[in-house]
Amino acid sequence: MFTGIIRDKGKIISISEGDKSRRITMKTKIDLEPISIGASVACDGCCLTVVEKTQDTLTFDVGAETMDLTTLGDWEIDKCVNLETSLRMGDELGGHMVSGHVDGIAIVESVKPDGESWRFKIRVPDQFAQYISPKGSVALNGISLTVNEVEGAVFGVCIIPHTWDVTNIKSWDEGTRINLEVDQLARYVARILQK
């Protein structure tokens, strides 16, 4: 489990293409001492398993389904990736509960400055619109964000300077594809109401 509070922006330094898979290595400033082989790390919101590590790099294998359902198939060398290590007992629960199981790909519709902050409009696939509500939570590229307003399959978020600085959100432009994970509680409530 994760909280959507980004720990570092990793930088992809190598990608090895396999048969319907990729091996991705990224450099990070996270203290890797407590992270073991087999540990889970959220990479742009997608829970991946550490298969190799050095003092300052992590390596992950990415399968075909993950590449199909997320933006990971689009990644290239030098891409900046939001990283979050998994929760440990005693960690602060600062964002919201994030599983790292990406639901699909959302598209940035617009980015506008708003004083010291930025307003983003995000379009989600129609089947996920029912899980997005004002003042609810959503994870975009692994970042825990609060929904400001909703109109159909488009919703708005406001990005404060701190989030702008410590995540890869400043690289998002109109048309950027981003990983979407809807709030788990919203999903469960919708499921119960369907019965």
Feature names for model-found ranges:
Residues 1-195:
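Conserved loop->alpha-helix
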